[in-house]
Amino acid sequence: MSCDTQEATRECLGMNLDGNKEPVSLVESGVRSESEHLQVTIGATVPTGFEQTAAGEVREKLKSACRISKDRGKIYFDIAVESLAQVHCLRSVDNLFVVVQEFKDYQFKDTKEEVLRDFEELAGKLPWSDPLKVWQINTTFKKKKAKRRKANQSAGKEKADCGQGDKADEKDGKKKHASSTSDSHILDYYENPAIKEEISTLVGDVLSSCKDETGQSLREETEPQVQKFRVTCNRAGEKHCFTSNEAARDFGGAIQEYFKWKADMTNFDVEVLLNIHDNEVIVAIALTEESLHRRNITHFGPTTLRSTLAYGMLRLCEPKPTDVIVDPMCGTGAIPIEGATEWSHCYHIAGDNNPLAVNRAANNISSLLTKSQIKDGKTTWGLPIDAVQWDICNLPLRTASVDIIVTDMPFGKRMGSKKRNWNLYPACLREMSRVCRPGTGRAVLLTQDKKCFTKALSGMGHVWRKVHVVWVNIGGLHAAVYLLKRTAQAFVHPSDQDEGRDPPW
């Protein structure tokens, strides 16, 4: 085990759950065997409407059964603790949490006082042990990553001070850029095979130290090092006689009494979640401090698409190796960047008519390349992605040269106008049908202006066939993602069709 892993293990044991202050020796075979049998339920929030897509990713990458909650935008699946690294590498999830206990049919009392009293009594009856171990491992590795990042930044500064010239300054700048990224960049840290091995070892250490713990020992350990916590209640349903704040207040007070933790609404260590949807109640512990959807974007625009939503749209069209994937209205480039990260055997083109948008997309691509070089520790040959400025109604692409088109079309709210969409949408669909391969091409288009899009699509039935529609919520706006299939009919330019002659292409 490496020195930094030992340091992380000591740090973890410094706040271990059974009060054992002595170093714990690691018995490799026994501990690994135990860790493999420790199963926990992980919950994840996903873009509303893409629950099936996220569940498919879980089944594909984790080989785990996944169930979709009746509360929209959430999925649940069981994993071994040592698979935590793979969970953080999922592309379709926004936030992660470990489930403490789930009540599928919780019986609420008739009065507010009785319900809140039940919440107070519930805190001491829950199986906190395993979820807190998972939270512990997750927190320890985030701290380790922060220390490594700080060390890399310091090393870069030292090289610059030693007169390494522009190259050292550039390298230091890259490391500074990496250090400014958010908690979501823990994804890259977890993707390292060496880190995955360290996770298994650390899991063993924690399980060994917590082997014989009880609820009483949990409470005792919090006294030397008091954790700060808060309770967040997410409630949906009309038949509740209490508010979210009341539930969080009383449940949080009971947790404080049980663990002797200190309540802190802003600078907290542990966030306990109380999710209530009708009669379904789930108590959980958050594993992410902020959403993972910002993972690839550093230069934001007025309508930047969430990376998790971009992944869901790309997954809908099932990219195959060597596919040419185009986003003709790319904005900040969220869709092509997500595509280049996950489907590196395809070629991705980001285009927009706004030079500011193209510049943002180019900067985001450059940042992604820099991050890849820092993560791998070596110079890479680049990414299968490029950005270009063009007119969506007159794309500089050959006819039938594109396999997939994925784009976020103007809603007519923050960008463009609904009046202009009546001319823009038909022209876009016509030009997309020209560059898309007949018979095999597909398009995934996101829009909130459903009336205009439906009208435009009705006039394109000879070249586009609607396959599926996913209803999503974008910042409170009810939008739709349309999956279209290109028909086998060859594109005929309107001018050639009117004159009755064969098109030049």
UniProtKB/Swiss-Prot annotation:
GO terms for molecular function: tRNA (guanine(6)-N2)-methyltransferase activity; tRNA (guanine(7)-N2)-methyltransferase activity; tRNA binding. Residues 171-287 form the THUMP domain. Residues 145-182 are annotated as: Disordered. Belongs to the methyltransferase superfamily. Part of the heterodimeric THUMPD3-TRM112 methyltransferase complex; this complex forms an active tRNA methyltransferase, where TRMT112 acts as an activator of the catalytic subunit THUMPD3. Its EC number is 2.1.1.256, 2.1.1.-. GO terms for biological process: tRNA methylation. InterPro entries: RlmKL-like_Mtase (IPR000241), RlmKL-like_Mtase_CS (IPR053943), SAM-dependent_MTases_sf (IPR029063), THUMP_dom (IPR004114). It holds the Pfam family THUMP. Catalytic subunit of the THUMPD3-TRM112 methyltransferase complex, that specifically mediates the S-adenosyl-L-methionine-dependent N(2)-methylation of guanosine nucleotide at position 6 (m2G6) in tRNAs. This is one of the major tRNA (guanine-N(2))-methyltransferases. Also catalyzes the S-adenosyl-L-methionine-dependent N(2)-methylation of guanosine nucleotide at position 7 of tRNA(Trp). Keywords: Cytoplasm, Methyltransferase, RNA-binding, S-adenosyl-L-methionine, Transferase, tRNA processing, tRNA-binding. It is an enzyme of class 2 (transferase). SMART domains: THUMP (SM00981). GO terms for cellular component: cytoplasm; cytosol; nucleolus; tRNA methyltransferase complex. Its main location: cytoplasm. PROSITE patterns: THUMP (PS51165), UPF0020 (PS01261). This is tRNA (guanine(6)-N(2))-methyltransferase THUMP3. Residues 156-173 have a biased composition (Basic and acidic residues). It is found in: Cytoplasm. Ubiquitously expressed. Abundantly expressed in the testis, also expressed in the brain, heart, kidney, liver, lung, muscle and spleen. Disulfide bonds: none annotated. It catalyses: guanosine(6) in tRNA + S-adenosyl-L-methionine = N(2)-methylguanosine(6) in tRNA + S-adenosyl-L-homocysteine + H(+); guanosine(7) in tRNA + S-adenosyl-L-methionine = N(2)-methylguanosine(7) in tRNA + S-adenosyl-L-homocysteine + H(+). The keyword DNA repair does not apply.
